[in-house]
């Protein structure tokens, strides 16, 4: 029996008291858990995104207030979990001040005809933060020749080469030299040796000399005719592809054609094709030190590519995913 009566008093059985205490404890624990979940969600910090744009006059053919501002405004409208700053090459410190870079978790970079104006000091400020895992870098379209992107690809090429020869020449001393492409910002011909490439020769029984040919960061064909492309999701489970259909038509864009002279990416998210048979790996991710770089190909400043909702979804997804790393 749960109750015993003695001299007109009712005594509660100890087991019943324990059950009641356990029930009260569990309800309190559940309430506290819900409180902390709701509180954490309420105070979650937004991902801080710095949109960098070289700003050149031909952007006016498709964008009223610069391409970078268009991206920033549309990303801001996509959700309250993204905080935006839009900066430009002509801003103080080229928009790459310590204040901006220390604030940002992700940089989205648009550059085309003014790539060479970015100073070596600013390239280092960006790439050092990427390598340290303090900043992620998104290169758009013609930013395959952005100086921070090329610096990141050069770093990755050398890292891949060292890992390769450490594996294939265990215990041997290997010294390295690097060779840049024949001329900066030139287009490689079809049939060229794909870069990056690395070779080593034997100096003696214990040491080797290796040569690393750095990546061209370009491709043999391009066609700025505004013809449509089909963007196909190759990694449907990837966070960058969340909420997207399997295939997306880009009504107006410039064509790039493989092979793209870059290190082998860690992930390929999208592939783009054209009616004449060209193809391109149009969404790629590399691990660069402790950080990440994402290259997204569609574009050309004369076409309203970044007014297309799917393109903004991709940039928003990428920013959230990279910012959480």
What residue spans do the PLM features occupy?
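Cysteine-centered motifs
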Residues: 15-17
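Positively charged n-region of N-terminal signal peptides that target proteins for export
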Residues: 19, 26-29
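Extracellular ligand-binding/catalytic regions of CAZymes and related secreted enzymes
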Residues: 45-46, 88, 159, 262-268, ...
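Short beta-strand segments enriched in small/hydrophobic residues
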Residues: 46-58
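Helical hinge/lid and interdomain linker segments adjacent to catalytic or ligand-binding clefts
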Residues: 56, 60-153
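Catalytic beta-strand/loop cores that center a nucleophilic Ser/Cys/Thr
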Residues: 78, 82-85, 102-103, 179-289
């Amino acid at each position: 029996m749960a109750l015993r009566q003695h001299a007109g008093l009712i005594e509660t059985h100890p087991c019943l008291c324990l059950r009641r205490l356990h029930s009260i404890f569990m309800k309190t624990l559940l309430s506290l858990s819900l409180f902390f979940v709701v509180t954490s969600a309420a105070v979650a910090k937004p991902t801080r995104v710095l949109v960098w744009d070289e700003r050149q006059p031909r952007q006016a053919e498709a964008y009223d207030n610069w391409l970078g501002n268009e991206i920033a405004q549309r990303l801001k409208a996509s959700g309250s979990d993204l905080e935006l700053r839009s900066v430009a090459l002509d801003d103080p410190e080229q928009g790459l001040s310590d204040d901006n870079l220390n604030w940002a978790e992700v940089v989205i970079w648009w550059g085309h005809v003014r790539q060479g104006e970015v100073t070596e000091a600013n390239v280092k400020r960006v790439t050092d933060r990427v390598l340290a895992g303090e900043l992620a870098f998104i290169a758009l379209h013609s930013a395959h020749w952005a100086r921070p992107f090329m610096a990141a690809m050069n770093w990755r090429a050398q890292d891949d080469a060292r890992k390769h020869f450490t594996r294939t020449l265990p215990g041997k001393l290997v010294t390295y030299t690097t060779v840049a492409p024949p001329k900066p910002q030139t287009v490689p011909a079809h049939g060229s040796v794909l870069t990056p490439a690395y070779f080593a020769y034997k100096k003696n029984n214990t040491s080797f000399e290796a040569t690393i040919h750095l990546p061209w960061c370009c491709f043999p064909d391009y066609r700025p005719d505004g013809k449509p492309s089909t963007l196909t999701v190759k990694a449907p489970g990837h966070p960058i592809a969340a909420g997207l259909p399997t295939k997306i038509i880009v009504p107006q864009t410039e064509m790039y054609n493989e092979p793209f002279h870059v290190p082998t990416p860690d992930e390929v998210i999208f592939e783009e094709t054209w009616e004449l048979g060209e193809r391109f790996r149009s969404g790629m991710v590399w691990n660069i030190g402790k950080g990440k770089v994402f290259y997204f190909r569609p574009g050309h400043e004369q076409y309203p590519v970044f007014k297309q909702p799917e393109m903004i979804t991709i940039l928003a997804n990428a920013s959230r995913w990279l910012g959480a790393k």
